[in-house]
Amino acid sequence: MKQDLARIEQFLDALWLEKNLAENTLNAYRRDLSMMVEWLHHRGLTLATAQSDDLQALLAERLEGGYKATSSARLLSAVRRLFQYLYREKFREDDPSAHLASPKLPQRLPKDLSEAQVERLLQAPLIDQPLELRDKAMLEVLYATGLRVSELVGLTMSDISLRQGVVRVIGKGNKERLVPLGEEAVYWLETYLEHGRPWLLNGVSIDVLFPSQRAQQMTRQTFWHRIKHYAVLAGIDSEKLSPHVLRHAFATHLLNHGADLRVVQMLLGHSDLSTTQIYTHVATERLRQLHQQHHPRA
């Protein structure tokens, strides 16, 4: 079992070098694959002897045991990548994961806010306080750009150009993209940089654009708590909240106003158009409005 766990670490090291996966993804893979090794060990199996039927049984057992379909899909992805690696490195002469069946994932529509709700959320911070001025700027940037929360809290001073009105984002897979900020976000960034950030830094020299109260990089969890706080002030139902609520609103509202799907894909940093297409459910609302406005029998 120790040898198998060691091979998993070798695989994760190789995966990090080849794919530059996020630390959270690597840690999730480590947990999933360690669980798999333990499961195999209890059945007298190893990474060298496990067959396709064994791996399929593991996946089925996880699903029947209450594993979410998304968690099972992640486990399947980790298993496939591991055995592809073992086959490539000639540790095995076959790849038992090649024909594993994928668990069916329910298509969940992203939670989104109306434009009026977004406006209330953006107005919630008290801009006469440096901390809330920072939050105001963050919310404006988030809605203007559709960044992931992890991308937002990771921004540095060198990532923004207020003169050009763009932000440089290093997204998933270390892919870089430039996203327009818009006049409103630029205004609040300028205001924050003059009246908020110096107070938060209190003499500390760091390049982080949105530092915490301790002049450090803010965590995603901290910003999520801030969003929930302002949502309460704005009278927004918690059922509509998620860490990426403004990212979803960004995509939804762009499409509602006629933006091309591929443009939205580029702005969001999606590598696959199908990931962006889930937002097209909002087009129904836009079509209904157009129908009511222009059809003689509407």
Swiss-Prot record:
Transmembrane segments: none annotated. Site-specific tyrosine recombinase, which acts by catalyzing the cutting and rejoining of the recombining DNA molecules. Binds cooperatively to specific DNA consensus sequences that are separated from XerC binding sites by a short central region, forming the heterotetrameric XerC-XerD complex that recombines DNA substrates. The complex is essential to convert dimers of the bacterial chromosome into monomers to permit their segregation at cell division. It also contributes to the segregational stability of plasmids at ColE1 xer (or cer) and pSC101 (or psi) sites. During recombination, the heterotetrameric complex catalyzes two consecutive pairs of strand exchanges, implying that specific pairs of active sites are sequentially switched on and off in the recombinase tetramer to ensure that appropriate DNA strands will be exchanged at both reaction steps. FtsK plays a central role in this catalytic state switch that turns recombinase on and off reciprocally. The reciprocal C-terminal interaction between XerC and XerD may also participate in the enzymatic switch process. Forms a cyclic heterotetrameric complex composed of two molecules of XerC and two molecules of XerD, in which XerC interacts with XerD via its C-terminal region, XerD interacts with XerC via its C-terminal region and so on. The lineage of its organism: Bacteria, Pseudomonadati, Pseudomonadota, Gammaproteobacteria, Enterobacterales. PROSITE patterns: CB, TYR_RECOMBINASE. The active site is at residues 148, 172, 244, 247, 270, 279. Residues 108-292 form the Tyr recombinase domain. Changing residue 295 to E: Abolishes DNA recombination (in vitro). This is Tyrosine recombinase XerD. Gene3D superfamilies: 1.10.150.130, Intergrase catalytic core. InterPro entries: CB, DNA_brk_join_enz, Integrase-like_cat_sf, Integrase_catalytic, Integrase_recombinase_N, Integrase_SAM-like_N, Recomb_XerD, Tyrosine_recombinase_XerC/XerD. Its main location: cytoplasm. Residues 2-87 form the Core-binding (CB) domain.
